[in-house]
UniProtKB/Swiss-Prot annotation:
GO terms for biological process: mitochondrial genome maintenance; mitochondrion-endoplasmic reticulum membrane tethering; phospholipid transport; protein insertion into mitochondrial outer membrane. Residues 415-434 are annotated as: Disordered. One of its GO terms (molecular function) is lipid binding. It comes from the Eukaryota. The keyword Endoplasmic reticulum applies. This is Maintenance of mitochondrial morphology protein 1. It is a single-pass type I membrane protein.
Amino acid sequence: MEMSELLASEVVSSGPDYAKKSVDGLNMTAANGTNDTLMTLDEYLNKSLPLHLEQLILDANQKELFDSAAKSLLSSTLLAKQQQSLQIAPIQPQSSFSSQSFAEGLIVGQLSVIVALIFVIKFFVFSEGGTKTATAKSVGSASSFMDSTKNSILSTIIKRGGKDGLEVDDKDNEKSRQINSILEKTYYNVETHSPESLDWFNVLIAQTIHQFREEALQKNNILNSLNDFIERRSNELPQYLDQIKITEVDIGDDFPIFSNCIIQYSPNSNKKRLEAKIDIDLSDRLALGIETKLLLNYPKPFSAALPIKLTVSIVRFQACLTVSLTTDEQFVPTSEETNDDEMGNDKGYYLMFSFNPEYRMELEVKSLIGARSKLENIPKIASLIEYQISKWFVERCVEPRFQFVKLPSMWPRSKNTRKEKTDTDDSVSVKSND
């Protein structure tokens, strides 16, 4: 680039000098010509003048060529310099940007590694008992996620009737299909099946009640539980009542009779739940007798006491019993004292039972008030006690309210395994005791 600049400058500088030298040469030749030989004007015009003019024109053309070449060289040099400046300018910020981004990425990477190491050391190496409660929710959510994934995997392994036990999205329709399948496979038609007598069920219930009565007589379970209940509620008794004592407990000698059992769809369930309607009839005497004193505080506290004896007996009970298997998700508790651990957290099936509002309960209330002059079987007291018992029963066991009983697991377990004791086992146990 520097050589081209020097050549252009030399051409520009030498152009005028060269033309001047050519004119001076012509003058000198003309002068010399006058000294040596004299030329005529015609010869000069015909011979010498054209040569001189041609030389002048050539010199002028050369000068123009030199000027154009110099200008083109200068313009080319300027364009080359501009292009070099444009190419160099964006390269410098790009290199600076790349170096800056590399430094930032390196710093961010190192910081992320340090934070990860601190997290691991804090929560996995130096974790204490207090942090366990703080992370209980996260652990619970993780365990629930693991359980769900485990159940989804096991559902592909467990089969039902040769089919995969996969979960069904439409659970409502699946329940109705399951009920229809049960009725079909057990050959039970809800619409046309006749009521059953349940004689075999009466025998089983009678054996269970008999065993319950034997234990109550031998171990005084009912009496002990009633005394404990009275002691726990003694602080809630009003001040005008003395201590309550149990005088009689009659557990009866007869058994309930179940009959006319039919299976039907539960109302308001859209054929998604079955229930059993069973007539129950009990003719027996179930009695509870207590005695206490009514403390009179006039004219001064504890100046007089009025003895009271009450005996309440159930002599007849007739009703229609409704029994169904369900889950606790389908109903809501009516009491605020319901424990969340008893219902809601324990998944499983419950035995639901209730009685029809058209039930019959016959009560006998015997009352005796006074020490010397006694008032016996006062109707007002009998009606008041009957009303309170009926109210208690309706609020707990009469439709639309139900009672739930959690069903235990029916899977065989080793701790529940037993075998019948024989005479040899008795003799061996006696010898070991001796």
